[in-house]
């Protein structure tokens, strides 16, 4: 099976998406049919596989590549005789941050009837906004850390105790994130987060907690639904991954080691993953990052499009992607009818 990779987008994570796409090329190799770049002007470009290097984009030379356009069922390119479809494959949405994870691209691909791997509109909106994610997780029976919402109109903490972590509500990759240990540090952290978003989430910061990452998706095996789980990773013990470390994290291609944890904890993490995934993220390969505090599992965040789609957590990443591509959700078909208009005209004719 071949995949087309859509990357770029207009977001603070634009460069990360490029790095992620270059890494995915190393992992998928000949399984990639086309690379499609969405630039900062929302124009699509067809990038030759042998040109997929980060310098192409930073230099602006990507504009020398073929510009392509969306039509129903396919991307097309202009020719002397009109528009010619590019052979379509299952598309991988690899746009991190806004455009890719906020539901914009999902809506566009759905509208033009292009099959794609990635979060759908509702799950994009829910997971892109950290406040919505907290509400969603609580409704699904998954625990979250204590938090408050700060806005420009109401920027004051009410009850949460220091230390805290401040995050822009709609941003990833540790951009605009800071740990606040005491009140005198609050103004700086708040100003930093407000540079990126008008809403901030303030969470209790627990140092020394165990953190585990688990990726996966749901597919069908015959008539049965089954989950394809990755191994569970215990990430770096560094207090907070800064942007540069997250940037490098998105370029990973070597498989990591399974965390040394009990089978009971594995089952707990997988159970919480399923609570979040079911009837929400079908068609997407997601990664959930969890905290474990006093043997209780808490959701840290949902990554609806993890860096290089968390290939480094899977033993058979291509196999999982292929299974998922054959199990994409189908929209209910709506038959448009004009019977009421016809009845009105018929009645008027009388």
UniProtKB/Swiss-Prot annotation:
It is an enzyme of class 6 (ligase). SUPFAM superfamilies: Glutathione synthetase ATP-binding domain-like (SSF56059), PreATP-grasp domain (SSF52440). ATP binds at residues 160-212. It catalyses: 2 D-alanine + ATP = D-alanyl-D-alanine + ADP + phosphate + H(+). Keywords: ATP-binding, Cell shape, Cell wall biogenesis/degradation, Cytoplasm, Ligase, Magnesium, Manganese, Metal-binding, Nucleotide-binding, Peptidoglycan synthesis. Binds 2 magnesium or manganese ions per subunit. Gene3D superfamilies: 3.40.50.20, ATP-grasp fold, A domain (3.30.1490.20), ATP-grasp fold, B domain (3.30.470.20). GO terms for cellular component: cytoplasm. Mg(2+) 1 binds at residues 289, 301. It is found in: Cytoplasm. Cell wall formation. PANTHER family: D-ALANINE--D-ALANINE LIGASE, D-ALANINE--D-ALANINE LIGASE B. This is D-alanine--D-alanine ligase.
